[in-house]
From Swiss-Prot:
CDD domains: AP2Ec
Cofactor note (record): Binds 3 Zn(2+) ions.
Reaction catalysed by this enzyme: Endonucleolytic cleavage to 5'-phosphooligonucleotide end-products
Protein name in the entry: Probable endonuclease 4
Example GO molecular function: deoxyribonuclease IV (phage-T4-induced) activity
Broad class of enzyme this protein falls into: hydrolase
HAMAP family linked: Nfo
NCBIfam families named in the record: nfo
Pfam families: AP_endonuc_2
Function field: Endonuclease IV plays a role in DNA repair. It cleaves phosphodiester bonds at apurinic or apyrimidinic (AP) sites, generating a 3'-hydroxyl group and a 5'-terminal sugar phosphate.
Gene: nfo
Binding site for Zn(2+) 3: H185, D230, H232
Amino acid sequence: MTELYIGSHLSTAGGWNALLERSHEEGGTAFAFFPRSPYGKRSKALDPADAATFGARLKAEDYGPLVVHAPYVYNLAGKDEAKRAFAIEALAEDIELLTAIREAGQEVYINIHPGAHVGQGTKTGCQLISEGLNQVFERTTGVMVLLETMAGKGTECGRNFEELATIMNGVKNKANVGVTFDTCHVLDAGYDLVNDYDGVMRQLDEAIGLAKVKAIHVNDSQFGLDSHKDRHANIGQGQLGIPFFTRLVNDPIMAKLPMILETKEQTPATHRDEIELLRGLVQK
């Protein structure tokens, strides 16, 4: 097996250099961050002029693909036209910021929660998400957008592989859209990763295609199968458990993807310890 590309979701406080130092401290070879506040305001810590230099540093240090996380506030499936227009405009701006990193030779994706239909129905919600992405891609196609697998709470779209496939099929520029596989969300949505790992992967391949999966959010689950709760647990301390993560990091397809921890930092060393734990599960 090759070395895992793995890290956590990091703070951007202090800018690009501080972001990379945090990754070094936890022993990471991949990481995620918000390009602006999770609530939508532009982050002043990240200077677009320095993005290319940052990308070149990552490339030189052999980092795996970055998996930047779009703010939670974006809702491409919403009924509020002003908020939806903001999400489209802001996502395009985020992609433009990240394009300089990719052009420096460093692979980078932007991950989004597909959206919540807020009572309009799943069909309408999925159509709105596809239309929103089409508008984004009319402005910029510099970075691939990854749709995150969702746990299915509330009116979330993307609660199963078929809904994600519907959204992707509605996007004109299909080469510019992929998927982030969130381990907690997939279990919570009703896919039995613990007892039927191979079966779940077959369903994913049939609905979307494994080649479209570009990143993994590595989280254990507090509540487990079909709970639709979306509550992350630390690695090995939830309903997925160490046997599942052993299977994941030894899967010849999935283990090649950047793995991002979104688990709670119980101590300053939590993510370093989890990175070491997961690397230790790889069979030599």
